[in-house]
């Protein structure tokens, strides 16, 4: 990995606390793409929004569960952020319950498993 790729990787690691293996590869092979992606993500997440940040994080956790129900750590991470920003456990549960019909039981289970871990850790 060249110096530019290393800088992108380190910046991403410090902001997120983790780097997906695919993003590590992109830092190595196409750091310009990672920079453009991160700039777009930072713009979207950083702009003034009518939607409360707690809902944005909750939506992200639901979207991750829909796209990849086995991404437990990522679902949990965004649920934790949402809860820290003011979402209740009940709101988190209801977000996942609301997508049962269009998305299926596996998505609800993925959300419930992540939420259960959080509730258990808080006890």
Segments the model singles out, each with a brief description of its role:
Residues 29, 39, 61-64, 98:
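Residues within well-ordered alpha-helical secondary structure of globular protein domains
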Residues 98, 103-106:
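Substrate/cofactor-recognition hotspot
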Residues 41-45, 60, 79-83, 93-97:
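Amphipathic alpha-helical segments within well-ordered protein domains
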Residues 67-93:
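Mid-chain, well-packed structural core segment of small domains
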Residues 52-59, 89-94:
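Alpha-helical scaffolds flanking conserved acidic
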Residues 1-55, 84, 110-123:
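Acidic, glycine/proline-rich low-complexity segments that act as flexible tails and inter-domain linkers
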């Amino acid at each position: 990995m060249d110096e530019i790729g290393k800088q992108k990787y380190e910046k991403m690691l410090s902001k997120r606390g983790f780097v997906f293996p695919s993003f590590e590869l992109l830092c190595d092979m196409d750091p310009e793409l990672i920079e453009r992606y991160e700039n777009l993500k930072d713009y979207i997440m950083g702009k003034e929004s009518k939607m409360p940040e707690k809902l944005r994080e909750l939506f992200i956790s639901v979207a991750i569960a829909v796209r990849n129900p086995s991404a437990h750590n990522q679902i949990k991470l965004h649920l934790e952020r949402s809860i820290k920003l003011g979402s209740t456990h009940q709101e988190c549960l209801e977000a996942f319950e609301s997508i049962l019909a269009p998305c299926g039981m596996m998505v609800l289970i993925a959300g419930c498993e992540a939420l259960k871990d959080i509730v258990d850790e808080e006890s």
